[in-house]
Amino acid sequence: MRADADRDSAETRAAELRARILDADHAYYVLDRPVLADAEYDRLVRELAEIEAAHPELATSDSPTQRVSGAPSERFERVVHREPMLSLGNIQSDGELDEFDARVHRLLGLAGDVQVGYVAEPKLDGLAVELVYEGGRLVQGSTRGDGVNGEDVTANLRTVGRTRANRGVPERLAGEVPPRVEVRGEVLLFKEHFEAMNRQILRAGDEPFANPRNAAAGSLRQLDWRVTARRPLSFIAYEALVPGAEPGGARAGPWAWRTHAEKLEALARWGFETNAENERCEGIAAVKAYRDRMAERRFALPYDTDGVVVKVDDLDWRRRLGAASKFPRWAVAFKYPPQEEATRIRRIWASVGRTGILTPVVDFEPVRLSGAMVSRATLHNEDEMRRKDVLEGDWILVRRAGEVIPEVVMPLKERRTGEERPFAFPAECPICGAKVVREEGEKVYRCTGAACPAQLVGRLTHFAQRRAMDIDGLGDKLALGLVERGLVKDFADLYAVPFPAWQELFSRPRKEERDAKAELPQKSAQNMVDALERSKATTLRRLLFALGIPQVGEATAATLARHFGELARFMDASEDALLAVRDVGPETAREIRAWTEEPQNRRVVERLLAAGVRPAPETVDAGGPFAGKTVVLTGGLAALSRDDAKAEIERRGGKVSGSVSRKTDLVVAGAEAGSKLEKAQALGVRVVGEEEFLRMLEE
């Protein structure tokens, strides 16, 4: 019983962690609006990885530990990378660096005294992109996206660095070049250019960018390339891939490199800027010495950096080392400890979220951390605030590692004067005036107001998010504008907002769009109307998640959708019928039934259907090659995202698992398949490639 309880607790925590990490990924990579500090994000990922290591059966195929974090926006055409653009595993200690070196030795079968050659370089804080050249001419440029699919931003990339020699994207390569080459690197803003750009923004009376990374991403991902052209972006190249010339391929021509250092030399010959701080290191001790030198110089460098990237230099060794589903085994990123600063609290106040939860927010005197000015942090709940013993008026230590929202580390009690006071949660909601309560056994205070505007804004953005109704462009500011103007009181109202109202909401361009064409408000309004129309064709699982039903996260929404099949059956399900659903317990069943019985909720659902929202019934194919089978996905697929492949398998009656065991029926191996493929082969599990997998889907 104890083991079952521990597993249930681990499963619940893993689901919570995945949800927080995926939301943070979406905010960082898609919206260019970070919501977590690096240190907090890394802590959540590590905690999730530890849970999945202790309970392999809980490792889902869509877990953030299994894939690259970004996601392509629907504002741009999708580009499929020939080779996945994987992210790097993060480490933070000498011990982890030694473990990385030992793992390289072990996987290559090298004796412990063999010095592995590494290339070390500063970890750039910008936007990863891929440039494709054919016959020496630029034919396509794309963002990394989710690692398999990126965004086509060719027109924008052609403008990068045109005003600064050797810091741009060449239109044509110099010298002898292969028929096709894929160049990867980082689009970034140097500190001097970032500060100059922000000064111009401030003179115009607008809000400056928080940091160079956000500014670079926002500048590159513009619908109007002329906006990008006016931004002082730079490009630094760090990788080149030539089809057939990688180790194990044809290895023909002068670009059949043996080492990464040779690649960097070729990139420089072709006209790219490479990082002048790159250094080849013999052995891990030399890497540590380089890391220490860079840590001392990091703030003197012309760009922001939060660590050092370490790569095996020998390309044949890289091929042998391969990659896991998310990270290459031949490279790692060593991240510096979060920078810390002392500052003084101005005030503590309570913000109200979509579920009515009041969160204590700390406003403090602005400090510069990791290149950005920050002045706010959250304390999550009253218990954390009391545990850290943070008082209004305190001097505090805050830290940040590249994100917008910092973390309060501790109060500096030795600097207290006696005038500091504990923060007391308000008895009434600061937004709507309704009563605020903290129920017995709960850690949070909640607003009891059913019509609270702050809750409505939160519910609208939840409804619109990518994994729910996927209404591209509907974020916090737009939702607030809708609520303030009285245009929207529930989800269904979104589909009734008239076109002129959307135009009015978009009439003041955002700072990154102020240089765009004059018809931008009309174009933005039309884009929003189109996004709303597209969202009407959804699935039952997405709609159930979007509605914000208590206790119904993504996983539960999918389970409910598969069980009931149709929205009407779900809405009319009794508490007993809900209890019959796998993984739905008594509390969840009660919460769901209370929600579906509420007349206002039923009216909103009816109005959504009347507006044209049509959730496709969840049907399960009882026949076919996947029915009743347990399938594991590994590596990147060119034709489908991991989420789409999982959905197709489940729709055909299969179950997708995150780990390979003797109970696994099938492994689908895409590009750069990792240890799961090796384990499947060792266990004799059937393995199919992407081409055969797509044929099976058509059966």
UniProtKB/Swiss-Prot annotation:
Residues the record marks as active site: 123 (n6-amp-lysine intermediate)
Necessary cofactors: Mg(2+); Mn(2+)
Alphabetical list of Gene3D superfamilies matching this protein: 5' to 3' exonuclease, C-terminal subdomain, 6.20.10.30, BRCT domain, DNA ligase/mRNA capping enzyme, Helix hairpin bin, Nucleic acid-binding proteins
InterPro entries for the chain: BRCT_dom, BRCT_dom_sf, DisA/LigA_HHH, DNA_ligase, DNA_ligase_AS, DNA_ligase_CS, DNAligase_adenylation, DNAligase_N
Keyword terms, alphabetized: DNA damage, DNA repair, DNA replication, Ligase, Magnesium, Manganese, Metal-binding, NAD, Zinc
SUPFAM superfamilies per UniProt: BRCT domain, DNA ligase/mRNA capping enzyme, catalytic domain, Nucleic acid-binding proteins, RuvA domain 2-like
Domain of life (superkingdom): Bacteria
Protein's job: DNA ligase that catalyzes the formation of phosphodiester linkages between 5'-phosphoryl and 3'-hydroxyl groups in double-stranded DNA using NAD as a coenzyme and as the energy source for the reaction. It is essential for DNA replication and repair of damaged DNA.
Similarity comment: Belongs to the NAD-dependent DNA ligase family. LigA subfamily.
Protein name: DNA ligase
Native source species: Anaeromyxobacter sp. (strain Fw109-5)
Gene from which this protein is expressed: ligA
